[in-house]
C-alpha cells in the first residue's frame, strides 16, 4: 500500500516486538500543538492505534491516556481514538453507548443544527490483536484462580480460557494494560493468585515484574480491532500528510427509528449497523390502557424501549451529504450525520508499531 497525501478532514510464540511511539512531540517552545485522547494506560491497543494515527501528521501531537472509554469523550482534546468493533467479539458497547448518549441530549427527538455541530469521525484503521496471559513473577499456571482484562479481550479469548482455566473467575477491567498493571499492586490475597490478558507491548513494558505464560490467546489468528478517529470542531484540526485515501469510504449516521433505515437500503449498501438502548426517558404507558394494544401487542414499542441505531454505509464520493442526495434532507430531520472514514493509516505505519 503506497503513501499519498490527502486533503480530507492458541499459544504460538512471536518474535516481533511492538514499538510504541512516544507520548507526543513538542513544538519549538516545548509545548504540543494538539492532543489525542486514547484508552490508557501506556501499553494498550488504544495507544498503538493512537500512535498510528499520530504518525499521519507532521505537527506535534501529544497522546493523552484516559482511564476509561467514557473519559476519552470527556477530554477537550483535538482528537479522540475509540475502539469500534472486533472480528471475534463484535461491537464495543462502551464506545457505542458513549457516542450515542453524547449525541442525544435527552430532549426532543430532533436536534437543532447547533447541537449537530459536534465531533466527527474522520478516519479508521484495523489493528492486528494478539493477547498474552501475564502473571506476577513466580506465579504458576496451577495457581491462577481468576483472570482480569477488558471485556473484549476476555470474550476474544473465551475458548482459550475454557480450555486452560475452566474454573477461573473472570473479572472485567477498563483496559487490557490497566489489568496487567493491577496485578503488580493487587493485595487481594483472599481470592488467590490471578492473571491478566494484555498486549505484547504491555507485557514488554512491565517485563521486570510480570511473566508471560501464554501468547496468542485469542480465538483466531486473524483477529483485528477497528479503531475510529474523531476530530473536535472547536479546535484547529491539522491535515494528515502521510495517510491514504480510503478505497471504500464510509459515512456514519445515528437514527432514532428502525423505519429510518429503509432509505439507506434503497440508496446505498449498509456496511455495518448496531442498535443500543437510547439514553432517553421512555414514555410511560398504562397497563390498563387497552387502546394502545393491538392483538395483545403494544403498538408503541419504541416508547417503552427507545433505541438508537448506529449505521455505517458505503458512499460513492458524494455521499448522503451531497446536495443532490435524496436522503440528505431526511438524514437532517430524523438522524445525525457523525462523520466519514475518508482516509486510513498505511500498512507500513501499522507494521511499524
Predicted regions and their residues:
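Domain-level signature for soluble enzymes in the chorismate/prephenate branch of the shikimate pathway
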Residues: 2-353
Amino acid at each position: 500500500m503506497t503513501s499519498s497525501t490527502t486533503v480530507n478532514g492458541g499459544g504460538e510464540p512471536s518474535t516481533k516486538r511492538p514499538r510504541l511511539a512516544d507520548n507526543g512531540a513538542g513544538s519549538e517552545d516545548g509545548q504540543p500543538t494538539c492532543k489525542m485522547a486514547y484508552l490508557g494506560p501506556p501499553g494498550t491497543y488504544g495507544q498503538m492505534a493512537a500512535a498510528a494515527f499520530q504518525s499521519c501528521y507532521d505537527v506535534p501531537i501529544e497522546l493523552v491516556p484516559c482511564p476509561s472509554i467514557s473519559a476519552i469523550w470527556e477530554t477537550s482534546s483535538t482528537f479522540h481514538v475509540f475502539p469500534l468493533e472486533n472480528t471475534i467479539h463484535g461491537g464495543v458497547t462502551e464506545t457505542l453507548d458513549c457516542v450515542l448518549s453524547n449525541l442525544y441530549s435527552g430532549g426532543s427527538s430532533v436536534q437543532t443544527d447547533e447541537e449537530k455541530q459536534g465531533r466527527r469521525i474522520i478516519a479508521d484503521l484495523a489493528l492486528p490483536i494478539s493477547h498474552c496471559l501475564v502473571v506476577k513473577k513466580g506465579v504458576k499456571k496451577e495457581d491462577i484462580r481468576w483472570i482480569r482484562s477488558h471485556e473484549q479481550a476476555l470474550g476474544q479469548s473465551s475458548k482459550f480460557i475454557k480450555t486452560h482455566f475452566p474454573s477461573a473467575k473472570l473479572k472485567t477491567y477498563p483496559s487490557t494494560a490497566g489489568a496487567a498493571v493491577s496485578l503488580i499492586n493487587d493485595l487481594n490475597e483472599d481470592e488467590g493468585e490471578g492473571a491478566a490478558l494484555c498486549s505484547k507491548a504491555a507485557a514488554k513494558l512491565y517485563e521486570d515484574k510480570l511473566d508471560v505464560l501464554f501468547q496468542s490467546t485469542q480465538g483466531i489468528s486473524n483477529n483485528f480491532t477497528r479503531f475510529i478517529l474523531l476530530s473536535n470542531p472547536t479546535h484547529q484540526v491539522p491535515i494528515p500528510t502521510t495517510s491514504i485515501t480510503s478505497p471504500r469510504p464510509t459515512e456514519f449516521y445515528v437514527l432514532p427509528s428502525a423505519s429510518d433505515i429503509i432509505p439507506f437500503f434503497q440508496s446505498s449498501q449498509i456496511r455495518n449497523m448496531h442498535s443500543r438502548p437510547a439514553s432517553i426517558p421512555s414514555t410511560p404507558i398504562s397497563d390498563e390502557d387497552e387502546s394502545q394494544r393491538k392483538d395483545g401487542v403494544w403498538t408503541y414499542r419504541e416508547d417503552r424501549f427507545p433505541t438508537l441505531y448506529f449505521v455505517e454505509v458505503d458512499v460513492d464520493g458524494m455521499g448522503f451529504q451531497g446536495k443532490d442526495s435524496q436522503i440528505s434532507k431526511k438524514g437532517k430531520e430524523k438522524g445525525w450525520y457523525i462523520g466519514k472514514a475518508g482516509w486510513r493509516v498505511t500498512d507500513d505505519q501499522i507494521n511499524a508499531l
